Amino acid sequence: VAAGPPAQISTLILPADVSWSDGAAATTAPTAGVSPAAAGEVVANIAKVLNSGTKTALLLGGRVLREEGLRAASRIAEKTGARLFCEVFPTRLQRGASVPHVERIAYLAEMASVQLEEFENLILVDAKAPVSFFAYPDKKSYLVPEHCTVHKLVEPEQDALKSLHALVDAVAAAHTQPKLPALDRPSLPGGKLTAAKVCQAIGALLPENAIISDEAQTSGVMLPAFTANAPKHDLLTLTGGAIGQGLPVAVGAAVACPDRPVLALAGDGSAMYTNQALWTMVNEDLDITVIILNNRSYAILNVELERVGAEGAGSKAKSQLDLSEPPIDFVALAQSQGMTATSVSTSRGFNRALENAFRQPGPHLIEAIVPSEFKGLKLKALPHILGALDSVPAPLAKAIKKKVAP
């Protein structure tokens, strides 16, 4: 069952006496089943949609977000004019120089609606139709526009990569060159440190073949833009909205790939869920650089509190999302678990700390003291901007989306 399509995590429940009883005889491991590709008729119908001249987008997920799948999808896009998107929180996304770019659906539902509004067809490739992360008053949760038809290339038990290659052939794109971005790092930032400048410095200094575990929340909104043309890397994101998974995921990545540098980004609030991962990083001597983006607030939850209509929250309720009293000393927290750590509040200091961490193998922590903002906007203003997107012309809405969350 565990090896058959669609292979997923399985749980084996054993009786307690297995610990002291005689072991069973070894057996031959079963051969993993081979998943079929999508039916030829399905592929042909979707090829017709792609060749119809209508505005069409492919929404990618799962294993097709690795380089081979992205190259196949890019061939289709270059041949047919379709746009490429991926899930809000991809499990694993390969990206950077020489890997075709794919735009992530925005976390904020209002901005996701702006992204999808122009399309008449949405083709799902190992992905689900996008929905909002939470339910909001007077807002729809299903984000596909009413005028847009959804098509599904594969079912869960089918091989998405084989099916995507079949679609490449069906639209005669096998000899079409995928669009491959060149290496183009941003410059190192200067001046007062902000979350955007942290992301800029990462793009400027990221090592080749790195793995990024991104749980930066509101502070990481500029990371995709500043690392799009950085050296090739893997991005692991917050699947399922499980705040606190970022540091343990970084541990898992470093154990699985000991020859690759790992970068873990975490907000101060999310880092407190699983700070014991710092001890594991030291105990296992893992090559992980941890960046804590410390704005002394559960900023993402403050935004969501207002967006769900919880108006007039009292001081006691607000204090539960305030991390300034008492302030958390992440340097002391890391050092108490044996980790080299430093705190910075200037871009120059952050650049130097990140260069040193990447240069020296092993676990390091950098606490970046940053203001509570969203791409330069005070977070209090964000819900009001989002609420206005429905009432402005589409070109202006797109411009706002590109400015706030590129």
Question: Can you annotate each of these PLM segments?
Answer:
Residues 1, 27-29, 68-81, 137-142, ...:
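Short, solvent-exposed amphipathic alpha-helical segments in soluble enzyme
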Residues 1-5, 104, 115-118, 122, ...:
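Conserved thiamine diphosphate
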Residues 2, 13-98, 175-243, 275, ...:
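Cofactor-pocket helix-loop regions in the catalytic cores of large enzyme subunits
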Residues 5-9, 52-55, 78-83, 117-121, ...:
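Short coil/turn connectors at secondary-structure junctions
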Residues 9, 13, 25, 126, ...:
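Phosphate/pyrophosphate-binding active-site segments
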Residues 14-15, 61-62, 87-89, 127, ...:
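Cofactor-binding loop segments of dinucleotide-utilizing enzymes, especially the Rossmann-like FAD-
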Residues 62-153, 228-260, 272-276, 307, ...:
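Glycine-rich, anion-gripping cofactor-binding loops and their flanking helix/strand elements
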Residues 221-406:
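Thiamine diphosphate
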